[in-house]
């Protein structure tokens, strides 16, 4: 887990650098920081909610002995949503780091 955490921190720092290059290194206010953080958090939650739905769907499909291609499609959705959720959380962490520069 330590190696993965280090890789994620690296990605957060890269995302932070990218955001600073595009939008400046500081927020104009803590209100702006909150708004951006809240948006990223909501996007992460949306991905998590869909992921949860797909996992529940997978379990229902398994219990009903669904066709393997249907199960495969659901697993592909789970994979995609997990990746997208991780991306949103990386962006959330990067924006939290940027907000720390305002304090």
Task: Please report, for each region that a protein language model flagged, where it lies by residue.
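Flexible "arm" and connector segments at domain edges
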Residues: 1-103
